[in-house]
Design a protein with these regions (language model features):
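Repeated polar recognition positions within modular binding domains
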Residues: 1, 22, 36-39, 63-65, ...
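Surface-exposed loop/turn elements that mediate protein-protein interactions on large endomembrane-trafficking
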Residues: 2-16, 40-57, 80-94, 116-131, ...
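Repeated scaffold domains used in trafficking and secretory/extracellular systems
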Residues: 18-29, 60-69, 96-106, 133-142, ...
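Short loop/turn segments that connect beta-strands within the blades of beta-propeller domains
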Residues: 20, 27, 39, 68, ...
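Residue position within the beta-strands of beta-propeller blades
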Residues: 32-35, 73-75, 110-112, 145-148, ...
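C-terminal, non-catalytic extensions of nucleic-acid polymerases
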Residues: 33, 50-51, 71-74, 125
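Small side chains
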Residues: 111, 119-121, 138, 186, ...
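Intrinsically disordered, low-complexity regions in large eukaryotic scaffold subunits
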Residues: 170, 206, 217-219, 224-225
Length: 229
C-alpha cells in the first residue's frame, strides 16, 4: 500500500507514506486515517505539505473511525464505541455498537445496534432512539435519516418512512445532497428521494472513503480507484 500525493496542476506525483489507509479524513492540510502497523491498527496523522507522519493512537482493532473538532471516535472489536482526544484522554461512549457514522452538522454519532439506530450527542452525552428495526448503516442526508438494511436504503423524514432504493447496496455514503451506494454491479449515486440514479464507477468494491470531494474505492488491501464528486 502506498499513499500518493498528486497535485492538481499536473506536477509529478510523490509518495507520502507506505500505508494501506482506511477511513480518510482531511482537515487543515492534515490527513488522518487508520492503518496497520506492528500487528495492530493505528490512527495516523500525515502532514500533506511536508510529509511528516505521526502515530496518534495504537488501538488494537479499529472497525470504524471518525474525527470531529479534534476528537477521534473509534469502534473496536468488542463493539465498544470510544472517543479519544488528540492529547490522549479516552472514554467509552456506548457498547453493543456494530457501526456508527458521524453527523458533523448536528454533532451526533448515529450508532447501529441490534435494536436499530441510536443518536448519541457528542456535546450533550444524551442518546435517543431514531430508528427501530434491522440496520447495517445509518447517516444523515440533509434533514433525512438514511438507513441501509439488507441491501435496501430506507429514508426516515418528518415521521414518514420509505424505501428509496433496492439495489443490494453493501455500503452507503453521503456527500452533500448526494446518496452513494456500493453495489455488486457498480457505484451509484441518487438524490435523497432515490431518484436520478447514475452509475459513477463500474465494478464491485469492498471499501470506500470520501476526502476533499473525492471518493476513494478499493478493498481491504487499499484504494485502487478515485472519483471526483
Amino acid at each position: 500500500g502506498i499513499l500518493v500525493k498528486k497535485p492538481y496542476n499536473g506536477a509529478a506525483a510523490s509518495v507520502m507514506a507506505y500505508d494501506v489507509p482506511r477511513f480518510l479524513h482531511l482537515t487543515n492540510g492534515k490527513l488522518y486515517y487508520v492503518a496497520s502497523e506492528g500487528g495492530e491498527d493505528c490512527v495516523i496523522r500525515l502532514n500533506t505539505q511536508n510529509g511528516s507522519r505521526e502515530v496518534l493512537a495504537r488501538a488494537g482493532v479499529v472497525l470504524k473511525f471518525a474525527l470531529c473538532d479534534g476528537v477521534m471516535y473509534m469502534l473496536d472489536a468488542n463493539a465498544a464505541l470510544k472517543e479519544k482526544t488528540l492529547s490522549g484522554e479516552e472514554s467509552e461512549l456506548m457498547t453493543g455498537v456494530s457501526d456508527f457514522t458521524l453527523d458533523a452538522v448536528n454533532k451526533t454519532l448515529l450508532c447501529v445496534t441490534q435494536d436499530g439506530v441510536t443518536a448519541f450527542g457528542i456535546r450533550t452525552g444524551q442518546s435517543e432512539s431514531v430508528y427501530t428495526g434491522a440496520a447495517d448503516q445509518a447517516m444523515m442526508c440533509g434533514q433525512a435519516l438514511l438507513v441501509r438494511s439488507g441491501g435496501s436504503v430506507i429514508r426516515v423524514m418528518n415521521g414518514q418512512m420509505a424505501t428509496i432504493r433496492r439495489d443490494g447496496a453493501s455500503c452507503l455514503l453521503v456527500y452533500g445532497q448526494k446518496v452513494i451506494e456500493l453495489t455488486s454491479s457498480g457505484v451509484m449515486t441518487c438524490d435523497v428521494n432515490g431518484e436520478n440514479a447514475t452509475t459513477i464507477a463500474d465494478g464491485s468494491f469492498e471499501a470506500a472513503s470520501i476526502a476533499n470531494g473525492v471518493l476513494y474505492l478499493g478493498s481491504a488491501s487499499g484504494y485502487t480507484k478515485s472519483v471526483s464528486l
